[in-house]
Design a protein with these regions (language model features):
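Conserved hydrophobic/aromatic beta-strand scaffold that supports enzyme active sites
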Residues: 16, 40, 59, 84-86, ...
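Conserved short histidine dyad/triad with adjacent acidic residue
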Residues: 21-24, 34-54, 77, 88-92, ...
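Short beta-strand segments in beta-sandwich/barrel cores
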Residues: 48-49, 65-70, 84, 114-116
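A short beta-strand-loop-beta hairpin characteristic of the jelly-roll/cupin
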Residues: 53, 59-81
């Protein structure tokens, strides 16, 4: 499964890439990722968080609502119920988050022990 991932480059700018969450299909193995903890994060529509970097690498699974993530170079990605993505922009200029729509945005936020690497082929 391919996941959108927000990472940081050498200049501190955050950019989106794609990370493969599984080992190659012929291996028949799932890729394990150690986690520190998980939590449920809930916000009302219209919530806005200005640019800041992630404190730790995190995986997000949207359970309800809609949110927009903006990287430091202005690229925006939109996520809604059923979407899973990674915020791995440790340090640097960070990202902004905005929730929109009519329903509460509920997200399963999983803090990982290390950054998930392995860019997927397009």
């Amino acid at each position: 499964m391919k996941l959108a991932s927000l990472n940081t480059d050498a200049n501190g700018d955050s950019y989106f890439t794609i990370v493969e969450s599984c080992d190659p299909p012929e291996s028949n193995k799932e890729r394990e990722q150690e986690v520190a903890y998980w939590e449920i994060w809930e916000t009302q529509p219209g919530y806005f968080q200005d640019f800041k970097p992630s404190e730790e690498p995190r995986s997000f699974a949207v359970l309800s609502g809609k949110l927009e993530i903006t990287g430091s170079l202005g690229e925006r990605r939109y996520f809604s119920r059923g979407d899973t993505f990674l915020l791995q922009d440790i340090g640097g200029k960070g990202h902004a988050i905005r929730t929109y729509g009519w329903e509460v945005c509920t997200v399963l936020r999983v803090t990982m022990k290390k950054i998930m690497t392995g860019t997927a082929k397009a």
